[in-house]
């Protein structure tokens, strides 16, 4: 988990450092990862003690004081005292609180900061929604296709069973007819004094054949029952997938795009753009204004997570000698061609469609 220690850039003294959080300059105690709330409020023309009087602030402090998930131990609410007339000492004096309170305090100080954080949160959940919607749509298409195959297979099995039932009925009828004829022949032969042992053996063989056909029919019926059970399971999954689907938003300008460009750049001829549609178009125009030759090699519309997608691309292609510099790419010293580069990106993009149905 990220810490305010990660935004520290200048040591004040001992374990106290200056840090930067958005547009706010912080005083951070690296030993506790807490920040100086007094100094933060003063920088925005407000007083920390006024924030502590708010009902919401009281509930927040009470909540975090009651938590026991801090691996460092000790208090996360403490005051550093000293002679504020001493310039060096006064830089670190004040009330220190947990990093979890910085969002509420900073939003109380600055409406602009609140608006910026609110937009970040909205963008995050919109992207998350689109990823889930796309995945559910893909799963639904696979489930529907499998259901269609199972139905066709079940229909074929039922047709085969009907044919065997008809054949069994014919054999049963033939057997009964044969028995009747044998009985008549037996009586005739008996009256003539002829041995009928051979005729009985032939009749037994015919009865054995009927028994084997009955066993085959039972096995087919069991197969049909198994297929019907699979169809029921798929129907349940299909109903769940349908219930989880959400409506597709209509704003194309907010949809994410991943674009691969080729430019007449001596060092990095390939360039990637990862942004919402409206910003991606602007980025392409900037490249066209900067270079004489700009060609779009690949354009993936509505990719749910271009950041994670690009990280996966870099991880795979660095192993093949491809060089990356932020959004720029060079394959001159690699083992792949331009065609390989495009195909590799398309292959990684297609992996998101893989779905396993248990």
Curated annotation (Swiss-Prot):
Domain called KilA-N: residue spans: 15-124
Keyword rRNA-binding: no
Keyword 4Fe-4S tagged: no
Transmembrane segments: none
Signal sequence bounds: none
InterPro entries: DUF3627 (IPR022549), KilA/APSES_HTH (IPR018004), KilA_N (IPR017880)
Coiled-coil intervals: 126-245
Key words, A-Z: Coiled coil
Record family assignment: Belongs to the IIV-6 006L/238R/313L/468L family.
Name of the featured protein: Putative KilA-N domain-containing protein 313L
Taxonomic source organism: Invertebrate iridescent virus 6 (IIV-6)
């Amino acid at each position: 988990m990220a810490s305010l220690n990660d935004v520290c850039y200048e040591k004040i003294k001992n374990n106290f450092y200056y840090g930067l959080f958005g547009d706010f300059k912080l005083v951070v105690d690296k030993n506790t990862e807490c920040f100086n709330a007094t100094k933060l409020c003063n920088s925005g023309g407000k007083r920390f003690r006024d924030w502590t009087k708010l009902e919401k602030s009281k509930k927040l402090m009470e909540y975090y004081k009651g938590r026991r998930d801090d691996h460092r131990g000790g208090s996360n609410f403490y005051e550093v005292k000293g002679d504020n007339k001493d310039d060096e000492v006064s830089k670190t004096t004040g009330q220190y609180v947990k990093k979890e309170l910085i969002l509420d305090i900073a939003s109380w100080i600055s409406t602009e900061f609140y608006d910026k954080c609110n937009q970040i949160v909205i963008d995050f959940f919109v992207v998350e929604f689109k990823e889930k919607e796309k995945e559910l749509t893909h799963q639904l298409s696979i489930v529907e296709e499998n259901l269609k195959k199972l139905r066709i297979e079940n229909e074929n099995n039922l047709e085969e069973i009907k044919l065997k039932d008809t054949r069994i009925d014919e054999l049963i009828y033939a057997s009964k007819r044969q028995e009747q004829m044998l009985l008549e022949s037996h009586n005739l032969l008996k009256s003539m004094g002829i041995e009928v042992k051979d005729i009985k053996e032939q009749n037994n063989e015919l009865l054995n054949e009927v028994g084997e056909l009955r066993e085959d029919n039972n096995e087919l019926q069991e197969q049909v029952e198994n297929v019907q059970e699979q169809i029921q399971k798929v129907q349940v999954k299909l109903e769940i997938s349908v219930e989880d689907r959400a409506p597709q938003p209509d704003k194309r300008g907010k949809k994410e795009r991943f674009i691969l460009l080729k430019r007449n750049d001596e060092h990095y001829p390939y360039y990637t753009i990862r942004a919402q549609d409206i910003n991606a178009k602007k980025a392409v125009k900037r490249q066209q204004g900067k270079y004489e030759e700009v060609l779009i090699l690949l354009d993936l519309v509505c990719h749910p997570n271009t950041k994670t997608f690009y990280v996966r691309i870099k991880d795979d292609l660095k192993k093949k000698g491809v060089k990356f510099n932020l959004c720029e790419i060079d394959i001159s010293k690699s083992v792949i061609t331009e065609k390989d580069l495009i195909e590799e990106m398309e292959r990684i993009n297609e992996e998101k469609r893989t779905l396993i149905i248990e």
